[in-house]
Curated annotation (Swiss-Prot):
It comes from Arabidopsis thaliana. Residues 312-411 form the Fibronectin type-III domain. Involved in both the vernalization and photoperiod pathways by regulating gene expression. GO terms for molecular function: zinc ion binding. It is found in: Nucleus. Signal peptide: none annotated. The lineage of its organism: Eukaryota, Viridiplantae, Streptophyta, Embryophyta, Tracheophyta. Interacts with VIN3. This is VIN3-like protein 3. Its main location: nucleus. Keywords: Metal-binding, Nucleus, Transcription, Transcription regulation, Zinc, Zinc-finger. One of its GO terms (biological process) is vernalization response. Induction: By cold, especially after vernalization and transfer to warm temperatures (e.g. 40 days at 4 degrees Celsius followed by 14 days at 22 degrees Celsius). A zinc finger (PHD-type) spans 137-207.
Length: 529
């Protein structure tokens, strides 16, 4: 065997006649036999030929000029031997000699341990069951593919929103896949009334709202700079509104936007050439008009109630919204025969809390067509979801849903101050001329003058005005009026007198209007320039 290799390539003349690939194949064969034979054959090759092979096998652009011939041969043998060992181990684990290509249709992979299945998506790598056909966390439940850079606005998700009946499976799908699926209800030219504004989950069949997805398309279109994405988002919004009877005004606005773009390009936006799609939106003649229609559609959507599986048949009016309470007025339509007693059920919760276990329920009974009721003990500055169901016996007649945001405590305090100011002004008008007339507005102007002249500090001004409008008694207000009248020509003396007399009063704690927590922010809001 040694004599054969010696004859074939054992001298410099023989090796120089061989191509680079032939020399490389011979080196691989020799490394599988023995190190001695490997070195014996390569000893007669030139250093440049061996260095060339070493650079190719090590995949490093190093000249190796500082090594002797024996050192170069030894290093080449070690590298080639390791490669042979690694290839042999791979063959034992994976019998197939062909390299498997990445398959996005079924994104599963055996890795990180024998027999364990993991998602091929590097951003997910979810552990999967052996019988799984796709990754439920990151892949589409229709086409089984995933996106490398997932854009949530291009996906529909089966969520656990309690406005619709049924349990959510939590799966998601591409928006375009849903358009092509008959099970989703989005393929129909005219959707039925029970899923208008909604879509059906292809996996479990649960009804979900598509309004949030519609809003995302319009918002992105309004902010987009590239023509291609701009037109694509408006096209998706147009498809989501196809055949709707519930959102006619919104559909008309989007339709106008589509027509403007069609007139601009001369072709439907679904057939937009790639050359046109690379342009900038602000260079379009119709850009301003299209964005105006998108904004009008968004404004209309914000004013509409959430979609429901049952059409509303009650007239609900929100009479007042405070920090901790909301008052409703319900009027039943005349077309419904309510009987002797009207039965309502109201379910409400914070928008941030989607778990049904935290939903609060109240049963309401009324013998008249009008019912007024107040929901108490709410959290200030919080969005609440309300659902009011009307019954005839045990049968549900209608469902109405809406979101209400409670006011902040400061908003209530400001309203109380404005009411106090109005009362003071009315009382001042009724007083006789020549009598002392000193209302809240005069107090505000006076204290600001003292602050601007450096007689009082900003902190004292805030606390004093808050105390004066919310906590001061009539007697204390009368004392302030006397001081103002007495020291009206000496601002420095007036400031000292107010500080000495009322420093303790303004820091004394009193029960506040409405029983809320103490706040000194009212005067701040009223006095900001």
């Amino acid at each position: 065997m040694a004599s054969f290799h010696k004859g074939a390539a054992g001298d410099s003349m023989g090796s120089s006649k061989m191509s680079f690939d032939q020399r490389r194949q011979l080196v691989l064969k020799l490394s599988k036999e023995s190190e001695r034979e490997f070195k014996e054959v390569l000893k007669d090759w030139s250093c440049n030929e061996i260095r060339e092979l070493l650079r190719a096998e090590s995949k490093k652009d190093i000249k190796y000029t500082g090594l002797t011939k024996d050192e170069i041969i030894t290093r080449l043998f070690n590298i080639v031997s390791k490669k042979n060992t690694r290839d042999h181990e791979v063959e034992e684990i994976i019998p197939s000699p062909k390299r498997q290509k990445r398959d996005l249709v079924t994104p599963l992979a055996k890795a990180k341990g024998k027999g364990k299945m993991y998602c091929q998506n590097l951003a997910c790598q979810n552990k999967l069951r052996e019988e799984a056909t796709f990754c439920k966390r990151c892949s589409c439940c229709i086409c089984f593919k995933y996106d490398d850079n997932k854009d949530p606005s291009l996906w529909l998700t089966c969520n656990s929103d309690s406005q619709f009946d049924g349990e959510s499976c939590g799966l998601s799908c591409h928006l375009n896949c849903a358009f092509d699926s008959e099970k989703s209800g989005l393929k129909e030219d005219t959707p039925s009334s029970d899923i208008d504004g909604c879509f059906n989950c292809v996996s479990c069949g649960k009804t979900n709202s598509k309004i949030e997805c519609l809003k995302k398309q319009l918002i992105i279109a309004n902010e987009e700079r590239r023509v291609g994405v701009f037109c694509y988002r408006i096209l998706l919004a147009h498809k989501l509104l196809k055949g709707t009877k519930k959102y006619i005004i919104v559909s008309e606005e989007v339709e106008k936007a589509v027509m403007h773009l069609k007139n601009e390009f001369g072709v439907p936006i679904s057939c937009l050439p790639s050359k046109m799609s690379r342009g900038l939106v602000n260079r379009l003649c119709c850009a301003e008009k299209v964005k105006k229609h998108c904004s009008s559609a968004l404004k209309e959507l914000d004013g509409l109630p959430l979609p429901s599986t049952i059409q509303g048949s009650m007239k609900i009016r929100i009479e007042s919204v405070l920090a901790t309470s909301v008052t409703f007025d319900i009027e039943a339509e005349e077309s419904f025969s309510w009987g002797d007693t009207n039965h309502y059920r109201m379910v409400y919760r914070k928008v941030s809390e989607k778990h049904s276990s935290k939903d609060l329920t109240r049963e309401l009974f009324s013998t008249s067509s009008h019912q007024r009721f107040t929901v108490m003990e709410l959290t200030p500055a919080t969005e609440y979801w309300f659902k009011i169901v009307s019954f005839s016996g045990v049968e549900e007649l209608s469902v109405d849903e809406f979101i209400v945001s409670t006011k902040t405590l400061q908003d209530e305090e400001v309203a109380a101050v404005l009411l106090n100011m109005s009362n003071c002004n009315n009382a001042n008008k009724m007083e006789k001329s020549g009598s002392c007339s000193f209302g809240f507005e005069e107090c505000v102007n006076l204290i600001r003058q003292l602050e601007c002249s450096g007689q009082v500090k900003s902190d004292f001004r805030k606390k004093f005005l808050t105390w004066y409008c919310l906590k001061a008694t009539d007697k204390e207000k009368h004392v302030v009026e006397i001081f103002v009248d007495t020291f009206k020509d000496d601002k420095e003396a007036l400031a000292k007198q107010l500080i000495d007399t009322f420093s303790d009063c303004i820091t004394r704690k009193h029960p506040e209007i409405g029983g809320g927590s103490e706040s000194a922010g009212v005067s701040l809001i009223l006095l900001q320039d």
